[in-house]
């Protein structure tokens, strides 16, 4: 569990930085450091109640845009985004943040190979 949390967090962060560099940001660390710090702090304090963003809101249209944009850069990153999105949707439903019916549209977009 510790390797899962610590090692994959590094992969997630560095992949985020790579995607931002690909989008033209020269120093993405400055942009993401406050956001990631707050996200980690909130996750440790509040658990699933700290979930925010398009998946927790049930915004399937935004998620579809994200999947397409990431797929243009890296199919591996897009697969990871879809997998983490499905896990996030399940956790958001379990935490009462997302209604099951709203999760259905998200899961359609986040299905492996969909959302392109």
Q: How should each PLM-predicted stretch be described?
A:
Residues 1-77:
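Helical "substrate-binding/catalytic lid" subdomain
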Residues 50-116:
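C-terminal active-site/capping subdomain that shapes the small-molecule cofactor and substrate pocket
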């Amino acid at each position: 569990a510790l390797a899962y949390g610590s090692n994959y967090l590094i992969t997630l962060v560095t992949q985020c930085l790579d995607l931002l560099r690909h989008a033209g940001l020269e120093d993405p660390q400055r942009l993401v450091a406050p956001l990631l710090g707050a996200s980690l702090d909130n996750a440790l304090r509040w658990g699933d109640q700290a979930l925010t963003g398009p998946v927790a809101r049930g915004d399937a249209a935004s998620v579809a845009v994200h999947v397409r944009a990431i797929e243009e850069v890296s199919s591996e990153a897009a697969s990871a985004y879809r997998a983490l999105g499905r896990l996030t949707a399940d956790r958001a439903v379990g935490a009462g943040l997302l209604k099951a019916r709203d999760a259905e549209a998200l899961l359609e977009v986040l299905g492996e190979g969909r959302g392109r």
